[in-house]
């Protein structure tokens, strides 16, 4: 009997002993078996600590408004796995995802190439460049870290949940005859599964401290990992003014063309409802993004720079239409819960918390801001709380244990923070914390729910149900 999408997801979760295992060898080998080529005529890969999802959303919306056929791959999802794969403005259907998972599973367990589409060989150490190819230029399926043959090559390939999903998305894109595919990095960049694909343009939105167990505990180390998505002789768009020197050194070392916010392109305010984007050869006045945080202008500007770097003609009207229409769930998303305003945001590190704090200051309410906060155990929760200290009056700490070993209880969370947050009430889950905050909210108050994608997902399930 054929598996449903949920049965496939349950199966995939059990196929690798670790939820995260960085490295490209397994994914490359499976891609070779699937005969995966370049997933679209043009590819943009987007990495960074914060702003990846928003930047992808802006790129997709602008390209769609220009009439391009676009596919996007993002993670994690909030309510449905289908959110991760979008094709021509819609989420992939259950049936499409099931077909893709079936193809990946067949390839994973078969040593022979079985996929359809353009077959490409994964170039390994000692291979000669393709005809007409510069010696340092990678193939569509990447050679960024010359991979030795896998131990036991030809046998079943163990894939993590993310690797399996990445291959499924690439398989779907290859079937869809797309003009542009936009890939969001899952973790880091250099060893992330999406990095088997060579982009025409790479983007690094921001670099800040997060995922220290995997990427390092300072911006230079983390920047080095993220810079691994850059390619020789290709544009690397940098969405912040003070990128770590490790990013710039890597770009210089491989011959990537760094396109930097603040020097190669800028954004500047025009009036309360408009702003201007410009580079050396192009200038356009645009409406404020529908995504409302101040940082979204930088994300939108970075998206425009990425599309400009593709060197394809786009009508000016598409930029304005895309900026004005791009949306993304879980980013300062507003709800009304029985008369109380509720804002949900996936921010989960100090940099994101600083941006969130700036937005709260810019959008004051007459009453209090009550915060429902739950976070994964490996996050800098004290740094997050410190960034919001002046904007939140009451804290409702929630346990986040349904996600397994990465979660933590409200008591554990309270032990890692100080001040008003440490003295906040503690609750069994996000639902209980949100209900408690709603019970204490007065007419002029608002509730902020934040701390992780899991926190927001639990809140959205409640808010969409109207409970």
Where do the protein language model's features map onto the residues?
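C-terminal helical cap/extension that packs against the catalytic core
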Residues: 237, 241-259, 270-274, 308, ...
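Active-site-proximal loop/hinge segments that shape catalytic or ion-binding/gating pockets
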Residues: 452
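Acidic, Mg2+-coordinating active-site environments of NTP-dependent enzymes
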Residues: 110-111, 135, 140, 154, ...
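Hydrophobic positions on the alpha1 helix immediately C-terminal to the Walker A/P-loop
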Residues: 54-58
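Nucleotide phosphate-binding/pyrophosphate-handling subdomain across enzymes
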Residues: 42, 180-185, 192-203, 207-211, ...
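Beta-strand->loop->alpha-helix junctions that form or flank phosphate-binding loops
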Residues: 73-76, 238-240, 252-270, 289-293, ...
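ATP-dependent carboxylate-amine ligase catalytic core
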Residues: 4-8, 18-41, 64-113, 124-140, ...
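Hydrophobic anchor at the beta1->P-loop junction of P-loop NTPases
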Residues: 44-46
């Amino acid at each position: 009997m054929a598996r449903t999408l949920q049965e496939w997801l349950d199966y995939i979760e059990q196929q690798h002993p670790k939820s995260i295992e960085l490295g490209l060898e397994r994914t490359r080998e499976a891609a070779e078996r699937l005969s995966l080529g370049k997933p679209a005529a043009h590819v943009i890969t987007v990495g960074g600590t914060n702003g990846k999802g928003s930047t992808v959303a802006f790129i997709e919306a602008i390209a769609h408004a220009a009439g391009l056929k676009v596919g996007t791959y993002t993670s994690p999802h909030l309510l449905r796995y289908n959110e991760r794969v979008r094709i021509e403005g819609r989420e992939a259907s259950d049936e499409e995802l099931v077909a893709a998972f079936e193809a990946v599973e067949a390839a994973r367990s078969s040593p022979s190439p079985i996929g359809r589409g353009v077959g490409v060989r994964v170039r390994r150490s000692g291979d000669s460049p393709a005809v007409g190819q510069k010696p340092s230029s990678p193939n569509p399926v990447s050679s960024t870290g010359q991979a030795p043959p896998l131990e036991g090559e030809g046998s079943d390939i163990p894939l993590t949940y993310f690797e399996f999903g990445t291959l499924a998305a690439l398989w779907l894109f290859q079937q869809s005859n797309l003009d542009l595919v936009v890939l969001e990095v899952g973790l880091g960049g250099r060893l992330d599964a999406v990095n088997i694909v060579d982009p025409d343009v790479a983007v690094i939105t921001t670099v800040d401290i997060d995922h220290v167990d995997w990427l390092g505990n300072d911006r230079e180390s983390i920047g080095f990992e993220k810079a691994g998505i850059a390619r020789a002789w290709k544009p690397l768009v940098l969405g912040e003014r003070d990128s770590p020197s490790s990013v710039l050194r890597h770009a210089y070392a491989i011959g990537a063309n760094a396109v930097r916010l603040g020097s190669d392109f800028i954004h500047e305010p025009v009036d309360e409802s408009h702003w201007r984007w410009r580079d050396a050869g192009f200038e356009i006045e645009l409406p404020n993004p529908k995504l409302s945080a101040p940082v979204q202008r930088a994300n939108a500007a970075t998206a425009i720079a990425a599309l400009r770097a593709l060197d394809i003609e786009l009508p000016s009207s598409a930029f304005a239409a895309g900026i004005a229409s791009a949306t993304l769930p879980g980013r300062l998303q507003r709800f009304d819960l029985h008369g109380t305003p509720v804002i949900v945001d996936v921010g989960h590190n100090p940099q994101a918390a600083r941006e969130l704090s700036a937005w709260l200051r810019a959008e004051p309410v007459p009453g209090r801001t009550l915060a429902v906060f739950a976070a994964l155990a490996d996050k800098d929760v004290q740094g997050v709380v410190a960034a919001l200290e002046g904007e939140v009056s009451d804290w409702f700490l929630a346990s986040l244990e349904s996600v397994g070993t990465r979660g933590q209880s409200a008591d554990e969370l309270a032990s890692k923070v100080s001040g008003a947050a440490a003295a906040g009430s503690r609750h069994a889950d996000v639902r209980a914390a949100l209900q408690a905050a709603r019970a204490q909210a007065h007419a002029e108050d608002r509730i902020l729910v934040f701390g992780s994608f899991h926190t927001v997902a639990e809140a959205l399930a409640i808010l969409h149900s109207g409970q």
